[in-house]
């Protein structure tokens, strides 16, 4: 396997950004928080913006896009985003017309030695997507967060991946017993909301049986989950797999 790095720079409701590097080429998936926070986290992870060839956006929500404007102003890097998500950001996102590569949920592009392919995901946003990244040697990585449930399309794209970044957003008891208003609890728990620990854990044995070796649990809720709770439940569900829980405020390396 070629020189490979996969880590979340930060992950959670305050901001999301994932760094994937294969050899001398890297991509970012999402760019939440601020450009300063992003570059500081990237430096802490041992990465560099000099290697970043493109940014891939999952959807338009602020915790995934708030650093895009400053990033677009400072770096000559294409921003791959679905037509629906871009429409939601415009006209305020004046940087998009000169940087955006608009695409449908079914899209594939070559970036260095990586083939990045998008697939549709169920979330309360406009045309949200996940991504697979296939390396030159055939190794596949996959990314799926902000998903209300595991659809057949998600399963089809994640099956066979060597490593997967997968949402494990909330513990159902913590969510329902917590302080959130009823409408917000309903939104989070819906089929177009966020994936629970239990739903994530139920899928892990299927991934392992199909060859997945590494999973990074991502987009954990600070209010309705804890890294230890998510990790303990996931490891109990699939003890054979290497599983790591992303930390909200610091880089978490899977590979």
Question: Which sequence ranges carry the predicted segments?
Answer:
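Conserved beta-strand hairpin/beta-sheet module of binuclear metal-dependent hydrolase folds
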Residues: 1-45, 129-145, 163
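Active-site metal-binding motif and surrounding structural segment of the metallo-beta-lactamase
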Residues: 35-81
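Structured catalytic core of nucleotide-sugar glycosyltransferases
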Residues: 7-17, 58-68, 90, 118
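Cap/insert and terminal regions of metallo-dependent hydrolase folds
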Residues: 152-248
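Metallo-beta-lactamase
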Residues: 83-139
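Active-site environment of divalent metal-dependent phosphoester hydrolases
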Residues: 14, 61-65, 86-89, 125-126, ...
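Active-site neighborhood of phospho(di)ester-bond hydrolases with catalytic His/Asp-centered motifs
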Residues: 29-32, 52-60, 80-83, 142-145, ...
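Metal-dependent catalytic neighborhoods of phosphoester/phosphodiester hydrolases
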Residues: 66-75, 90-92, 225-232
């Amino acid at each position: 396997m070629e020189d490979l790095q996969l880590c979340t720079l930060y992950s959670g409701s305050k901001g999301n950004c994932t760094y994937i590097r294969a050899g001398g080429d890297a991509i970012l998936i999402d760019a939440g928080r601020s450009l300063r926070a992003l570059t500081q986290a990237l430096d802490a992870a041992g990465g560099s913006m000099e290697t970043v060839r493109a940014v891939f956006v999952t959807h338009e929500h602020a915790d995934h896009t708030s650093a895009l404007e400053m990033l677009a102003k400072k770096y000559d890097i294409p921003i791959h985003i679905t037509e629906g998500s871009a429409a939601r950001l415009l006209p305020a996102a004046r940087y998009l017309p000169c940087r955006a590569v608009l695409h449908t949920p079914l899209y594939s592009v070559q970036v260095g030695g990586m083939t990045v392919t998008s697939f549709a995901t169920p979330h309360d946003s406009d045309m949200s997507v996940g991504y697979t990244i296939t390396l030159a040697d055939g190794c596949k990585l996959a990314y799926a967060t902000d998903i209300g449930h595991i659809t057949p399309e998600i399963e089809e794209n994640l099956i066979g991946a060597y490593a997967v970044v997968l949402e494990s957003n909330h513990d159902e008891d913590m969510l329902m017993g917590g302080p959130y208003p009823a409408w917000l609890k309903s939104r989070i728990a819906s089929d177009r909301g966020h994936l629970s620990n239990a739903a994530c854990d139920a899928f892990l044995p299927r991934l392992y049986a199909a060859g997945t070796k590494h999973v990074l649990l991502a987009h954990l809720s600070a209010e309705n989950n804890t890294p230890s709770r998510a990790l303990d439940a996931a490891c109990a569900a699939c003890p054979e797999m290497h599983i790591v829980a992303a930390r909200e405020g610091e880089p978490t390396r899977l590979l």
